[in-house]
Amino acid sequence: MRGGAAGKRRTTVGFGGAPPPPPPSIEQQRHLFNSRDSDASFASSRPSSIGLGGRGASDDRSSMIRFINAFLSTHNFPISIRGNPVPSVKDISETLKFLLSALDYPCDSIKWDEDLVFFLKSQKCPFKITKSSLKAPNTPHNWPTVLAVVHWLAELARFHQHLVSNSTSVPEDNSMNFFAIQSFGHFIRGEDDKVNDLDSQFLGKLEAEKTSVAETISGCEKISGELEAKLESLRKGPSKKESLEKVKADLENDVNKFRTIVVEYTDRNPAMEKVVEEKAKELKAKEEERERISVENKELKKSVELQNFSAADVNRMRRELQAVERDVADAEVARDGWDQKAWELNSQIRNQFHQIQTLAIDCNQALRRLKLDIQFAVNERGETPAAVMGVDYKSVVKPALCSLCDGIKGSSAEKVEELVTLQHHKSEMASKIESKRSLLGSIQLQINDLEEKMKLVKKETQELSTKCDLEAKTLVESVKAEALNLEVVEKEAAEFVKASELRLQEAVKESEEEVQACAAQLFALIDSISKQKEYMDSKISEIKTGVADTASAVSEIYKANFKKNLGI
């Protein structure tokens, strides 16, 4: 039977965390399971819903099956649902029983189908299912609805388990309000012992929070000490110049390594050039072979074209192929039309049969109220009206109704006689009522007196409530004073943290100033070294010129002496 939406699905709270992809809506599922294929399409190679979104329906069903199998696998359930072929009746029934157990719903092993139908109705499931459809759930008519019900139960079970796993107590975010409400409630009830216990508990919590604040302050002091130690280590450690010199030495080593690698690759270049030349020669040989093969292919094409095929034969073959294609297309269109008509007729018959079933149920209920031993039993395979309804109206139902009508007429006459007697009783009751009204007047006076007394009691209770309100206000003020003390402690802690941060900033500034002073000294030293270098260069140039002059003078003196010696 087709699943129809009997009511709207109840909105549920979303899962915590990253929830899973959202399931298809009720309208999508209703469209999916109302647009199923007809009976004739199961025997054919193509479904009757071609062009009506059949592929989307199959995708939705496959996504439902994947969701159900994922849920069953997470619970180590040995059975998995398949789309093609359809699972057996036993697998479907075991899956439904398991889902009911996952929802903590007691299920009878024998009458589990009745329990399932009652559970779906109580939870307002959007898909209708009956016991008769559960007897054969894997038939083409029942399988889409059963699959939708299984998917709906799996979603409900997952949501139920999420609620069970994430069941949290009532939040107590504002502890002060919670304490005030509880203490006032105990005070109103006169439970002084519980009030004292609650006060002691709350004071214990406040002391625990105070100790936690003290611990955070000590932790901040430890952090400030660690930061000061780091500052001292930075002062005592190597300067930036030394670290930069180390980096420079490492970079020079890397440059030398890269130079050696470049030299090695330049040595390998001639060998690689030889390999490239060999590959170029092989490529030329391959191109020559390709040209030869292309020439052979052209010759083969020419020989094929020279074969005898007349144009008339080719045109005739084309026309025959076109005619065959048109016949095939017409046959497919006709088959689709007949499938559509069969599907529509089946849907109309099914709707009429459902209406007959509902009418038969209403008639059976009316016959039970009339206390007649006649019941309509609808039969799908009946050929005559009597066979379909299970009872012949003219021979069985009509005589019974006529006899019932005669009995009603006889009983109506008796009721008229009873009505006359009841009117006499009515007059007697009226006299009794008047006597009782006088009694009610006296009772009303007593009630008024009691109401005045109640007003006095209410005034007293209001005065007591005002007193209780004043006492509650005093308690609230005391709690607020303690809260202010806590805020003062927190402010002192925050000021201490700020002071430590300011000290740290001052220390950092001092270290930066010292570094800048060292850098200025370094730059001054570099300037003096450059000036000294220039001075030494000028001195060396002067010495070189003097040495050159002395060398020229010595050579001239030597030449003069040598000439003198030669003249002698």
UniProtKB/Swiss-Prot annotation:
Which residues fall in a compositionally biased region of kind Basic and acidic residues? 28-39
Decide whether keyword Acetylation is in the record. Answer: no
User: One GO BP annotation here?
Assistant: cell division
The cross-references to Pfam families, in alphabetical order and at most eight, read:
Ndc80_HEC
Entry's Gene Ontology molecular function annotations: microtubule binding
Q: Which UniProt keywords apply?
A: Cell cycle, Cell division, Centromere, Chromosome, Coiled coil, Mitosis
Where does this one sit in the cell? Chromosome, Centromere
InterPro entries this protein is in?
Answer: Ndc80_CH (IPR055260), NDC80_plants (IPR055307), Ndc80_sf (IPR038273)
Q: Where is it mostly found?
A: nucleus
Q: Where are the compositionally biased (Low complexity) regions?
A: 40-49
Its assembly, as annotated, is:
Component of the NDC80 complex, which consists of NDC80, NUF2, SPC24 and SPC25.
Task: State the family it belongs to.
Answer: Belongs to the NDC80/HEC1 family.
Its job: Acts as a component of the essential kinetochore-associated NDC80 complex, which is required for chromosome segregation and spindle checkpoint activity to ensure proper cell division.
UniProt protein name? Kinetochore protein NDC80 homolog
Whichever gene encodes this chain, its name is NDC80
